[in-house]
C-alpha cells in the first residue's frame, strides 16, 4: 500500500491527516488518553514534549555559515513577515474579541489565529519553489526562516502589541531547545545530519497530538473562515514580501511571493501560546483549525502565484 504517497498528495498532508485523525479520536472518545494511559496517553496528549524534540532537531539544521547575500535575502523576508504580523496584531486587537468571533462567516477568527498564520513561513515549500524558480542564494534563505519555528516569534509579537505579558523564563524556555540543537548542529556536521532526519519523522506525531485537542465540529464551523484566512495571509504578507525582496533583498520579487505561506508547524502555535497565556485558551481550538486550513490554502495557491511572478520577471528581463 502506498499510504505515504497518498497522504502527501494533500498539501501538508503528513501533518494535517494525522491532525484530522486525532480530532476524530477526540470527538468519538474524548477520554482515550486518560483511559489507556501509559505510552498511548503520551502519543495522544504529548504535544509539548513532541514539539520540544522537533524544535531541537530543527535548530540542528540551521547552519551558522551563510554568505552575506543569503543573509541579506533571508533577513529581509523574515523581518518583513514578522513586521507585517505585528502590524496586523496591533490593528486587529481592538476589533476582534480575544476569544475569537463567535459566529458568522469569520467564525473563530482571532488575533491569535492571525499572528500564528502570518508569522511563520513554510520553509520546505519555499526551498522547493526557489530550487525551481530562483537561485541558490534564494533557496539558501531558508536558513533564517528556520528561526521562525516555534512560538517565540508569536510570543514577541503578542507581547509587543500589548495583548499578552510573558515572564522572561517563558521566552528562554521557548527558544532553549532550538538553541541547543543549533549549537550541536554547528559543532558537529554528523550530528546535524543525524538530527535533521527526525524533523520530518516527528511531524505526524505532533499533528496527531494536536488533533486530540480539537473537536471535529470546531473544524467544520471554521471551514470558510480558514479559507479566507489562507487567502488573507497571501494578500496581506505577499505584497510587502514581494517589495522587500525587490528593494531590500535585491531579488525580482519571486522569493517574496514564495515566502507568503503558512508553515505546518504554525498549527501548534495557538495551543502553545494558550498554555502560557490563559486568556487565549478560549480562542486556541478555533485558531488551531483556522491555521490548519490556512496551511492547505497557502500550500495550493503560493506555488501557482510564484510561477506567475517568475514568468512575469522573465518577461520583464527578456
From Swiss-Prot:
Its main location: membrane. It catalyses: 2-dehydro-3-deoxy-D-gluconate(in) + H(+)(in) = 2-dehydro-3-deoxy-D-gluconate(out) + H(+)(out). InterPro entries: 2keto-3dGluconate_permease (IPR004684), 2keto-3dGluconate_permease_sub (IPR018395). GO terms for molecular function: 2-keto-3-deoxygluconate:proton symporter activity. It comes from the Bacteria. It is a multi-pass membrane protein. Belongs to the KdgT transporter family. Catalyzes the proton-dependent uptake of 2-keto-3-deoxygluconate (KDG) into the cell. This is 2-keto-3-deoxygluconate permease. It comes from Xanthomonas oryzae pv. oryzae (strain MAFF 311018). The gene is kdgT.
